[in-house]
Amino acid sequence: MKTSLLLVLVTGLSLVLTAGSCLQGKHVVGSKNYISQEVKADHFNEIKLLGSANISYHQDTRSHVEIHGSDNIIPLVETYVDGNTLMIKFKKNVSIWKGKLEIKVFAPELNKLSINGSGNIKLINGIQTSKDIEFHINGSGNIQGEGLNCRRMAVSINGSGDVRLQQIESQECQAGISGSGNINLKGKAIQAKYAIAGSGNIQAADLEAENTDASISGSGNCSCYASQKLVAREKGSGHI
């Protein structure tokens, strides 16, 4: 009887450990045998980064992706175009101890960049477009860059991520935070609109706008600029 009970306990423990291992996923350590690979990616004007990868965007005449990293890590990076969106992520249930990994995205024009997770996007040579641009973070990722010329720019954070954009030239700029993230903007705009719901901060005193509308519902703070008209609303402990 004792032997049977012990067997049941051991079997049960083995199943629990196996299940936990499956949930945790596979750990892959980079070989440090570095290679480069070019991935075909045609006809996209949006980037969606899922997970913890770090990528850089280069405005270029030809659309493609270049990946530089360990030869056993590169096959674990998934890049594909869904509609007009370039999707970038690691394979499911894989934990990457990546060491050096560079993912470079090239495209003539982008209208939206989004992060769902803890990854980072850096704009290397800015974005020049006559259309609108949208930046969105859901999680703890970061977006940074300089040299943005567009019709309308919208920045939103849901979580603890950060956005830092400089040398902005836009007719209209909107920025919103829901959470504890931070937005830092510098440049020029005709219209600016800021909204904070949470503890995050918007630093836009160096974004020279003619007309500015700012509202806070929470404990965050907003610094802003208006040369002609400022509308400010505070609901909570935050300050404008």
What are these regions (language model features)?
Residues 1-240:
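Intrinsically disordered, low-complexity terminal regions
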